[in-house]
């Protein structure tokens, strides 16, 4: 069984209401059934089942806060639903929580900067659990120094040719879509763009860190 969370239903009512409490209880049931029984098995294997993404998508976990037109649930959803989600998943397994929610550091960039065509292409399959998205920022030469990013992207007709390396990418070995921070302009943060790279793109490779 999962121990009680730090914030219980009926308390801290300044921020939490019945909607948050109901979500917490439903999510706790999901975690107890789909995560807790398998944690030791996944720890030994060094990874958790990809099937969990699909189950989380069907449950509605991955679409929390994303527009309904992309298959998400945004009406009545606020930041505290997200806090509840992080708490309850972490109660089951912190590593699973970090990987399962890697979409929340990648899809927001597509939501904010992408075209409608890109949003329709990438967001629905990720929040449905059919595809996995991640964010690539950290580089071997400078960590997460965004202003100092060296990975370059040069336009070539209708495409960009990207040269560089990223590391420490959450869900990096199993993702289908990579939102990569690249330098397309001058020095500093103003010269950085976010480009979606799909797994299987010619010249793209993944190497596990061991």
PLM regions: where:
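Mature N-terminal segment immediately following signal peptide/propeptide cleavage
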Residues: 17-27, 32, 38
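Internal helix-loop-helix
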Residues: 58-130, 170-177
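A short, Trp-centered hydrophobic/proline-enriched beta-strand micro-motif
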Residues: 129-137
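Hydrophobic, small-residue-rich alpha-helical packing segments that form membrane-like cores
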Residues: 142-145, 160
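Intrinsic disorder at enzyme termini
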Residues: 1-22
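C-terminal helix-coil-helix/basic helical segment that borders enzyme active sites and/or dimer interfaces
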Residues: 36-47
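A short core secondary-structure module
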Residues: 159, 163-207
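A structural signal for short hydrophobic beta-strand segments in well-ordered beta-sheet cores
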Residues: 151-154
């Amino acid at each position: 069984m999962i121990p009680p969370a730090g914030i219980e239903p009926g308390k801290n009512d300044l921020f939490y209401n019945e909607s948050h409490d109901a979500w917490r209880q439903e999510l706790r049931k999901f975690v107890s059934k789909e995560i807790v029984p398998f944690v030791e098995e996944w720890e030994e294997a060094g990874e958790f089942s990809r099937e969990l993404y699909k189950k989380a998508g069907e449950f509605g976990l991955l679409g929390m806060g994303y527009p309904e037109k992309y298959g998400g649930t945004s009406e009545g959803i606020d930041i505290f639903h997200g806090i509840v989600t992080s708490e309850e998943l972490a109660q089951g397994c912190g590593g699973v929580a970090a990987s399962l929610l890697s979409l929340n550091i990648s899809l927001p960039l597509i939501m904010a900067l992408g075209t409608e065509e890109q949003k329709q292409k990438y967001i629905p399959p990720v929040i449905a659990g059919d595809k996995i998205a991640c964010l690539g920022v950290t580089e071997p030469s400078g960590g997460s120094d965004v202003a100092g990013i060296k990975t370059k992207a040069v336009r070539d007709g209708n495409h960009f040719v990207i040269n560089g390396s990223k590391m420490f990418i959450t869900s990096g070995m199993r993702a289908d879509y990579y939102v990569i921070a690249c330098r397309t302009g001058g020095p500093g943060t103003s010269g950085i763009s976010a480009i979606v790279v799909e797994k299987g793109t010619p010249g793209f490779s993944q190497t596990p860190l061991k």
